[in-house]
Protein backbone atom coordinates (compact mmCIF):
# COMPACT_ATOMS: atom_id res chain seq x y z
CA UNK A 1 0.00 0.00 0.00
CA UNK A 2 1.37 3.41 -1.00
CA UNK A 3 0.19 7.01 -0.82
CA UNK A 4 1.48 10.28 -2.15
CA UNK A 5 2.36 12.87 0.44
CA UNK A 6 -0.45 15.06 -0.87
CA UNK A 7 -2.92 12.22 -0.27
CA UNK A 8 -1.68 11.78 3.28
CA UNK A 9 -1.99 15.52 3.90
CA UNK A 10 -5.60 15.48 2.75
CA UNK A 11 -6.34 12.52 5.04
CA UNK A 12 -4.94 14.13 8.20
CA UNK A 13 -5.49 17.81 7.44
CA UNK A 14 -1.81 18.76 7.21
CA UNK A 15 0.15 21.21 5.07
CA UNK A 16 2.85 19.93 2.72
CA UNK A 17 6.17 21.75 2.59
CA UNK A 18 8.14 20.21 -0.26
CA UNK A 19 7.26 17.54 -2.80
CA UNK A 20 3.61 16.60 -2.52
CA UNK A 21 4.06 13.94 -5.22
CA UNK A 22 6.49 11.97 -3.07
CA UNK A 23 5.40 8.33 -2.81
CA UNK A 24 5.23 7.12 0.78
CA UNK A 25 5.48 3.38 1.40
CA UNK A 26 5.57 3.10 5.17
CA UNK A 27 6.29 4.59 8.58
CA UNK A 28 9.50 4.40 10.60
CA UNK A 29 11.38 6.12 13.44
CA UNK A 30 13.66 9.01 12.53
CA UNK A 31 16.82 6.91 12.89
CA UNK A 32 15.62 4.08 10.62
CA UNK A 33 13.42 5.84 8.06
CA UNK A 34 14.33 5.78 4.39
CA UNK A 35 13.50 8.03 1.43
CA UNK A 36 9.98 6.59 1.06
CA UNK A 37 9.11 6.49 4.76
CA UNK A 38 7.26 9.00 6.90
CA UNK A 39 8.40 9.76 10.45
CA UNK A 40 7.51 12.43 13.00
CA UNK A 41 9.26 15.04 15.12
CA UNK A 42 7.63 16.86 18.02
CA UNK A 43 10.17 16.71 20.86
CA UNK A 44 13.19 19.03 20.83
CA UNK A 45 15.19 16.26 22.47
CA UNK A 46 15.31 14.54 19.08
CA UNK A 47 16.34 17.59 17.05
CA UNK A 48 19.66 16.04 15.96
CA UNK A 49 17.93 12.85 14.86
CA UNK A 50 15.45 14.96 12.88
CA UNK A 51 18.23 16.84 11.11
CA UNK A 52 20.17 13.64 10.33
CA UNK A 53 17.18 11.51 9.32
CA UNK A 54 16.92 10.04 5.82
CA UNK A 55 13.11 10.02 6.06
CA UNK A 56 11.36 11.09 2.89
CA UNK A 57 8.89 13.13 4.92
CA UNK A 58 8.64 14.09 8.58
CA UNK A 59 5.43 15.16 10.31
CA UNK A 60 6.14 18.27 12.41
CA UNK A 61 4.35 20.85 14.53
CA UNK A 62 3.30 24.11 12.79
CA UNK A 63 6.11 26.15 14.37
CA UNK A 64 8.94 23.64 13.90
CA UNK A 65 12.18 24.92 12.34
CA UNK A 66 12.84 22.95 9.17
CA UNK A 67 16.34 22.21 7.81
CA UNK A 68 16.93 23.39 4.26
CA UNK A 69 15.65 20.94 1.67
CA UNK A 70 13.63 18.88 4.14
CA UNK A 71 10.16 17.75 3.04
CA UNK A 72 7.69 17.91 5.90
CA UNK A 73 4.02 17.67 6.67
CA UNK A 74 3.00 20.38 9.11
CA UNK A 75 0.15 19.38 11.41
CA UNK A 76 -1.44 21.02 14.43
CA UNK A 77 -0.81 17.83 16.40
CA UNK A 78 2.15 16.04 14.84
CA UNK A 79 1.86 12.90 16.96
CA UNK A 80 -1.86 12.51 16.25
CA UNK A 81 -1.33 13.08 12.53
CA UNK A 82 1.46 10.50 12.50
CA UNK A 83 -0.75 8.04 14.37
CA UNK A 84 -3.49 8.43 11.74
CA UNK A 85 -0.96 7.97 8.95
CA UNK A 86 0.46 4.89 10.66
CA UNK A 87 -3.05 3.43 10.86
CA UNK A 88 -3.34 3.73 7.08
CA UNK A 89 -0.31 1.47 6.69
CA UNK A 90 -1.23 -0.81 9.60
CA UNK A 91 -5.02 -1.01 9.61
CA UNK A 92 -6.86 -2.83 12.42
CA UNK A 93 -7.34 -6.56 12.09
CA UNK A 94 -10.45 -7.46 10.14
CA UNK A 95 -12.53 -10.43 11.27
CA UNK A 96 -12.75 -13.55 9.15
CA UNK A 97 -16.34 -14.54 9.91
CA UNK A 98 -16.12 -18.10 11.17
CA UNK A 99 -16.25 -20.24 14.28
CA UNK A 100 -13.30 -22.61 14.46
CA UNK A 101 -14.31 -26.25 14.98
CA UNK A 102 -11.94 -26.37 17.97
CA UNK A 103 -13.83 -23.56 19.72
CA UNK A 104 -16.33 -24.49 22.43
CA UNK A 105 -19.61 -22.63 22.01
CA UNK A 106 -22.52 -23.36 24.32
CA UNK A 107 -25.78 -23.95 22.43
CA UNK A 108 -27.47 -21.04 24.20
CA UNK A 109 -24.68 -18.57 23.38
CA UNK A 110 -25.34 -16.00 20.66
CA UNK A 111 -22.41 -15.32 18.34
CA UNK A 112 -23.05 -12.84 15.53
CA UNK A 113 -22.48 -14.36 12.08
CA UNK A 114 -19.88 -11.70 11.25
CA UNK A 115 -17.78 -12.46 14.36
CA UNK A 116 -14.67 -14.63 14.40
CA UNK A 117 -14.04 -17.19 17.14
CA UNK A 118 -10.65 -18.88 16.94
CA UNK A 119 -9.59 -22.36 18.12
CA UNK A 120 -9.77 -23.21 21.83
CA UNK A 121 -11.85 -20.18 22.73
CA UNK A 122 -14.91 -20.90 24.85
CA UNK A 123 -18.22 -19.05 24.92
CA UNK A 124 -20.45 -19.94 27.86
CA UNK A 125 -24.21 -20.29 28.29
CA UNK A 126 -26.28 -17.25 27.29
CA UNK A 127 -23.13 -15.26 26.45
CA UNK A 128 -23.32 -12.78 23.57
CA UNK A 129 -20.61 -11.90 21.03
CA UNK A 130 -21.39 -8.88 18.85
CA UNK A 131 -20.90 -8.17 15.18
CA UNK A 132 -17.35 -8.21 13.76
CA UNK A 133 -15.79 -9.03 17.12
CA UNK A 134 -12.62 -11.15 17.03
CA UNK A 135 -12.10 -13.75 19.75
CA UNK A 136 -8.57 -15.16 19.85
CA UNK A 137 -7.50 -18.61 21.09
CA UNK A 138 -7.80 -19.29 24.78
CA UNK A 139 -10.37 -16.58 25.45
CA UNK A 140 -13.10 -17.50 27.95
CA UNK A 141 -16.39 -15.60 27.84
CA UNK A 142 -18.36 -16.93 30.78
CA UNK A 143 -22.05 -17.46 31.38
CA UNK A 144 -24.25 -14.48 30.61
CA UNK A 145 -21.38 -12.16 29.67
CA UNK A 146 -21.98 -9.72 26.82
CA UNK A 147 -19.39 -8.45 24.36
CA UNK A 148 -20.33 -5.70 21.91
CA UNK A 149 -19.48 -4.99 18.30
CA UNK A 150 -16.03 -4.55 16.71
CA UNK A 151 -14.17 -5.76 19.79
CA UNK A 152 -10.77 -7.45 19.79
CA UNK A 153 -10.15 -10.05 22.50
CA UNK A 154 -6.55 -11.25 22.45
CA UNK A 155 -5.43 -14.70 23.68
CA UNK A 156 -6.28 -15.79 27.23
CA UNK A 157 -8.62 -12.93 28.02
CA UNK A 158 -11.25 -13.91 30.59
CA UNK A 159 -14.63 -12.17 30.83
CA UNK A 160 -16.42 -13.52 33.86
CA UNK A 161 -20.11 -14.27 34.22
CA UNK A 162 -22.64 -11.49 33.56
CA UNK A 163 -19.99 -8.85 32.88
CA UNK A 164 -20.54 -6.37 30.06
CA UNK A 165 -18.05 -5.18 27.44
CA UNK A 166 -19.11 -2.39 25.10
CA UNK A 167 -18.32 -1.69 21.45
CA UNK A 168 -14.84 -1.22 19.92
CA UNK A 169 -13.11 -2.49 23.05
CA UNK A 170 -9.59 -3.95 22.88
CA UNK A 171 -8.57 -6.41 25.60
CA UNK A 172 -4.88 -7.32 25.50
CA UNK A 173 -3.62 -10.83 26.33
CA UNK A 174 -4.32 -12.19 29.77
CA UNK A 175 -6.51 -9.42 31.11
CA UNK A 176 -9.41 -10.42 33.35
CA UNK A 177 -12.76 -8.66 33.47
CA UNK A 178 -14.87 -9.46 36.51
CA UNK A 179 -12.60 -11.48 38.77
CA UNK A 180 -13.81 -11.61 42.36
CA UNK A 181 -13.27 -8.48 44.41
CA UNK A 182 -11.08 -8.80 47.50
CA UNK A 183 -13.73 -8.91 50.19
CA UNK A 184 -13.52 -10.85 53.45
CA UNK A 185 -15.18 -10.52 56.85
CA UNK A 186 -13.19 -11.73 59.86
CA UNK A 187 -14.96 -14.54 61.69
CA UNK A 188 -13.34 -15.15 65.10
CA UNK A 189 -15.22 -18.42 65.63
CA UNK A 190 -15.03 -19.90 62.17
CA UNK A 191 -17.98 -22.23 62.81
CA UNK A 192 -15.84 -24.59 64.81
CA UNK A 193 -12.80 -24.44 62.55
CA UNK A 194 -11.02 -21.59 64.29
CA UNK A 195 -10.68 -17.95 63.25
CA UNK A 196 -10.93 -17.31 59.53
CA UNK A 197 -11.54 -14.70 56.88
CA UNK A 198 -15.07 -15.33 55.63
CA UNK A 199 -15.44 -14.65 51.90
CA UNK A 200 -17.98 -11.95 51.06
CA UNK A 201 -19.86 -12.96 47.89
CA UNK A 202 -18.94 -10.71 45.00
CA UNK A 203 -22.40 -10.59 43.50
CA UNK A 204 -21.96 -7.56 41.24
CA UNK A 205 -20.47 -7.22 37.78
CA UNK A 206 -17.84 -5.29 35.86
CA UNK A 207 -18.82 -2.98 33.00
CA UNK A 208 -16.36 -1.85 30.32
CA UNK A 209 -17.85 0.94 28.22
CA UNK A 210 -17.27 1.74 24.53
CA UNK A 211 -13.81 2.48 23.06
CA UNK A 212 -11.85 1.25 26.07
CA UNK A 213 -8.49 -0.51 25.78
CA UNK A 214 -7.17 -2.63 28.65
CA UNK A 215 -3.57 -3.85 28.76
CA UNK A 216 -2.04 -7.27 29.25
CA UNK A 217 -2.60 -8.96 32.61
CA UNK A 218 -4.70 -6.12 33.96
CA UNK A 219 -7.44 -7.13 36.41
CA UNK A 220 -10.81 -5.42 36.73
CA UNK A 221 -12.58 -6.88 39.77
CA UNK A 222 -16.33 -7.30 39.82
CA UNK A 223 -18.34 -5.33 42.35
CA UNK A 224 -19.46 -6.68 45.68
CA UNK A 225 -22.88 -5.28 44.75
CA UNK A 226 -23.67 -3.15 41.73
CA UNK A 227 -20.93 -2.57 39.15
CA UNK A 228 -17.26 -1.80 38.78
CA UNK A 229 -17.12 0.55 35.78
CA UNK A 230 -14.52 1.64 33.24
CA UNK A 231 -15.77 4.74 31.44
CA UNK A 232 -15.97 5.39 27.72
CA UNK A 233 -12.65 5.90 25.93
CA UNK A 234 -10.50 5.15 28.97
CA UNK A 235 -7.14 3.48 28.30
CA UNK A 236 -5.58 1.15 30.86
CA UNK A 237 -1.98 -0.06 30.61
CA UNK A 238 -0.54 -3.46 31.51
CA UNK A 239 -0.59 -4.88 35.05
CA UNK A 240 -3.19 -2.52 36.47
CA UNK A 241 -5.50 -3.57 39.31
CA UNK A 242 -8.95 -2.05 39.84
CA UNK A 243 -10.68 -3.15 43.04
CA UNK A 244 -14.36 -3.90 43.47
CA UNK A 245 -16.80 -1.06 42.85
CA UNK A 246 -14.13 1.27 41.44
CA UNK A 247 -15.55 3.69 38.89
CA UNK A 248 -13.38 5.31 36.23
CA UNK A 249 -14.88 8.22 34.32
CA UNK A 250 -14.54 8.68 30.57
CA UNK A 251 -11.20 9.31 28.84
CA UNK A 252 -8.94 8.41 31.77
CA UNK A 253 -5.34 7.25 31.24
CA UNK A 254 -4.17 4.64 33.75
CA UNK A 255 -0.50 3.72 33.29
CA UNK A 256 1.24 0.45 34.18
CA UNK A 257 1.17 -1.04 37.68
CA UNK A 258 -1.40 1.37 39.08
CA UNK A 259 -3.52 -0.04 41.89
CA UNK A 260 -6.88 1.47 42.82
CA UNK A 261 -8.61 0.14 45.93
CA UNK A 262 -12.30 -0.56 46.23
CA UNK A 263 -15.08 2.01 45.78
CA UNK A 264 -12.79 4.85 44.68
CA UNK A 265 -14.24 7.05 41.94
CA UNK A 266 -12.23 8.87 39.28
CA UNK A 267 -13.73 11.66 37.20
CA UNK A 268 -13.32 12.47 33.53
CA UNK A 269 -9.87 12.66 31.96
CA UNK A 270 -7.89 11.62 35.04
CA UNK A 271 -4.25 10.60 34.46
CA UNK A 272 -2.54 8.17 36.84
CA UNK A 273 1.15 7.69 35.96
CA UNK A 274 3.03 4.45 36.58
CA UNK A 275 2.79 2.72 39.97
CA UNK A 276 0.33 5.17 41.50
CA UNK A 277 -1.46 3.68 44.49
CA UNK A 278 -4.90 4.96 45.54
CA UNK A 279 -6.63 3.85 48.73
CA UNK A 280 -10.31 2.99 48.78
CA UNK A 281 -13.44 5.12 49.05
CA UNK A 282 -11.90 8.31 47.60
CA UNK A 283 -13.16 10.81 45.03
CA UNK A 284 -10.65 11.98 42.41
CA UNK A 285 -12.00 14.94 40.44
CA UNK A 286 -12.09 15.60 36.71
CA UNK A 287 -8.76 16.27 35.03
CA UNK A 288 -6.58 15.29 37.99
CA UNK A 289 -2.99 14.27 37.18
CA UNK A 290 -1.07 11.99 39.55
CA UNK A 291 2.71 11.68 39.18
CA UNK A 292 4.48 8.32 39.03
CA UNK A 293 4.58 6.36 42.30
CA UNK A 294 2.27 8.80 44.05
CA UNK A 295 0.45 7.50 47.10
CA UNK A 296 -3.07 8.94 47.17
CA UNK A 297 -4.57 8.85 50.65
CA UNK A 298 -7.26 11.54 50.37
CA UNK A 299 -9.69 13.10 47.92
CA UNK A 300 -8.16 15.19 45.12
CA UNK A 301 -10.02 18.22 43.76
CA UNK A 302 -10.76 18.59 40.06
CA UNK A 303 -7.86 19.92 38.00
CA UNK A 304 -5.17 19.34 40.64
CA UNK A 305 -1.77 17.81 39.88
CA UNK A 306 -0.24 15.83 42.74
CA UNK A 307 2.96 13.86 43.33
CA UNK A 308 4.76 12.02 46.09
CA UNK A 309 3.81 9.81 49.01
CA UNK A 310 1.69 10.93 50.69
CA UNK A 311 0.59 12.93 47.67
CA UNK A 312 0.87 16.70 47.78
CA UNK A 313 0.53 19.49 45.22
CA UNK A 314 3.11 18.91 42.49
CA UNK A 315 4.82 22.29 42.99
CA UNK A 316 5.25 21.56 46.71
CA UNK A 317 6.65 18.14 45.91
CA UNK A 318 9.20 19.65 43.51
CA UNK A 319 10.35 22.04 46.23
CA UNK A 320 10.63 19.23 48.75
CA UNK A 321 12.67 17.16 46.31
CA UNK A 322 14.99 20.11 45.70
CA UNK A 323 15.43 20.52 49.46
CA UNK A 324 16.04 16.79 49.85
CA UNK A 325 18.98 16.95 47.45
CA UNK A 326 20.53 19.63 49.66
CA UNK A 327 20.35 17.52 52.83
CA UNK A 328 23.91 16.06 52.62
CA UNK A 329 25.41 19.56 52.37
CA UNK A 330 23.14 20.84 55.12
CA UNK A 331 24.14 17.94 57.34
CA UNK A 332 27.83 18.74 56.88
CA UNK A 333 27.20 22.41 57.63
CA UNK A 334 25.27 21.55 60.80
CA UNK A 335 28.08 19.27 61.98
CA UNK A 336 30.64 22.04 61.38
CA UNK A 337 28.46 24.55 63.22
CA UNK A 338 28.06 22.12 66.11
CA UNK A 339 31.83 21.64 66.37
CA UNK A 340 32.35 25.41 66.29
CA UNK A 341 29.69 25.86 68.95
CA UNK A 342 31.38 23.21 71.10
CA UNK A 343 34.72 25.03 70.77
CA UNK A 344 33.13 28.32 71.76
CA UNK A 345 31.47 26.73 74.76
CA UNK A 346 34.71 25.05 75.81
CA UNK A 347 36.61 28.33 75.55
CA UNK A 348 33.99 30.18 77.56
CA UNK A 349 34.00 27.57 80.30
CA UNK A 350 37.82 27.68 80.53
CA UNK A 351 37.95 31.42 81.26
CA UNK A 352 38.34 32.56 84.93
Swiss-Prot record:
InterPro entries: Hexapep, LpxD, Trimer_LpxA-like_sf, UDP_GlcNAc_AcTrfase_non-rep. The keyword Repeat applies. One of its GO terms (biological process) is lipid A biosynthetic process. The keyword Disulfide bond does not apply. PANTHER family: UDP-3-O-ACYLGLUCOSAMINE N-ACYLTRANSFERASE, UDP-3-O-ACYLGLUCOSAMINE N-ACYLTRANSFERASE 1, MITOCHONDRIAL-RELATED. NCBIfam families: lipid_A_lpxD, PRK00892.1. Belongs to the transferase hexapeptide repeat family. LpxD subfamily. This is UDP-3-O-acylglucosamine N-acyltransferase. The gene is lpxD.
Amino acid sequence: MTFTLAELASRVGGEVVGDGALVVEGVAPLEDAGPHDVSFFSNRKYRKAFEASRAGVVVVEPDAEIPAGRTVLRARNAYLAFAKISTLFHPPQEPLPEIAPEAVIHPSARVHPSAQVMPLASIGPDAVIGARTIVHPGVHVCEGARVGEDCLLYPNVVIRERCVVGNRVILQPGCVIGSDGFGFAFDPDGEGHGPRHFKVPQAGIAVVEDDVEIGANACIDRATLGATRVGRGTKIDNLVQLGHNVELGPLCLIVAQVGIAGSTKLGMGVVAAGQVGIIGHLNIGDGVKMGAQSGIAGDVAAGDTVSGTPAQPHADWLRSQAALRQLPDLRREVKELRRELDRLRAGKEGKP
